[in-house]
């Protein structure tokens, strides 16, 4: 049986737990934080930060969350990245469309997907504007840089709001397929905007193996030519870093809108503070409000309902 092991932060582990909310097992092995069994894979997350993926889809699931650690014995246990879709040498200095998403692990708020075209002649300017991995930037910096970027480079942005997200999820669509559809559409939109200008490459921040990504798009017009995938793609090309900044900027705007609508601050993430906020929203606006504010299938929904019951009893 194939397996992969990755190391993640506590916050990333919490996001993973929420993502697999529908397939969590009631009991967990000793030393584990959670165990989930999505199709073709058993996932066990340990307090040490290590996450073990086992089964025929181990490589696919592990690739959503990070790079697997090098195996100590058998070299065949980790699925190698498909060389056909690995970024080419020298891509950092090429003219590239980069694509990334924000909001997939947040209980409140939409998923925002952005792609941005960074012409090789603009790379120095983008560095001067402060473009880098968005994880290293605070929200005020994101806002400042994004406002400059959207006036400087071609981009495309899509926002999947909660009500539509919940409709798609309830019809059986996985979050992975939603993301694939959004990335493909955003890239298609940007290529049309560029009026015939051809990028040297298209780089997608990898959330699934390329074969799975393209399978999600079966039956649709797929942008495939010169398309490459990599985890941590923000550090490979500035176009992906720019896309991430624009996507996060949009996410912040949407969260502000939700906060105004709710009459309270809507928090990011999926931790206990989010459960409390969701419980407060239920008390103030009714349980039905969750449909337009949250990703209903996350475990936070049931946790918030239990909090409300305790507060009312």
Swiss-Prot record:
Q: How is the cofactor bound?
A: Manganese or magnesium. Binds 1 divalent metal ion per monomer in the absence of substrate. May bind a second metal ion after substrate binding.
One cellular component term (GO) for this entry is:
cytoplasm
Which interval of the chain is the signal sequence? none
One GO biological process term is: mismatch repair
The enzyme's main class, written as a single word, is: hydrolase
Recorded catalytic reaction(s): these are: Endonucleolytic cleavage to 5'-phosphomonoester
User: HAMAP family attached here?
Assistant: RNase_HIII (MF_00053)
Name of this protein: Ribonuclease HIII
Taxonomic lineage per UniProt? Bacteria, Bacillati, Bacillota, Bacilli, Bacillales
């Amino acid at each position: 049986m194939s397996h992969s092991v990755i190391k993640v932060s506590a916050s990333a582990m919490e996001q993973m737990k929420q993502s697999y909310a529908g397939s969590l097992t009631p009991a967990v092995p000793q030393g584990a934080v959670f165990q989930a069994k999505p199709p073709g894979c058993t996932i066990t997350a340990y307090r040490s930060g290590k996450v073990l993926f086992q089964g025929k889809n181990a490589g696919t699931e592990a690739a959503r969350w990070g790079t697997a650690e090098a195996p100590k014995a058998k070299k065949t246990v980790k699925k190698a990245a498909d060389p056909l879709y690995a970024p080419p040498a020298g891509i950092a200095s090429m003219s590239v469309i980069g694509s990334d998403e924000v909001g997939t692990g947040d209980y409140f708020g939409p998923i925002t997907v952005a792609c941005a075209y960074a012409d090789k002649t603009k790379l120095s300017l983008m560095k001067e504007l402060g473009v880098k991995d968005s994880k290293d930037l605070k929200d005020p910096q994101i806002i400042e840089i994004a406002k400059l970027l959207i006036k400087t480079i071609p981009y495309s942005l899509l926002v999947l709001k909660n009500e539509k997200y919940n409709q798609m999820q309830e019809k059986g669509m996985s979050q992975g397929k939603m993301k694939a559809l959004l990335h493909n559409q955003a890239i298609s939109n940007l290529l049309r905007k560029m009026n015939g200008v051809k990028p040297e490459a298209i780089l997608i921040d990898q959330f699934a193996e390329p074969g799975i990504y393209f399978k999600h798009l079966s039956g649709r017009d797929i942008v495939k030519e010169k398309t490459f995938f990599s985890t941590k793609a923000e550090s490979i090309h500035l176009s992906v870093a720019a896309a991430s900044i624009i996507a996060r900027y949009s996410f912040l705007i949407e969260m502000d809108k939700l906060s105004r609508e709710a009459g309270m601050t809507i928090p990011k993430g999926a931790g206990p503070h989010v459960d409390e906020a969701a419980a407060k929203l239920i008390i103030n606006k009714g349980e039905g409000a969750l449909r337009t504010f949250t990703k209903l299938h996350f475990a936070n929904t049931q946790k918030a309902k239990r909090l409300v019951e305790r507060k009312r009893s």
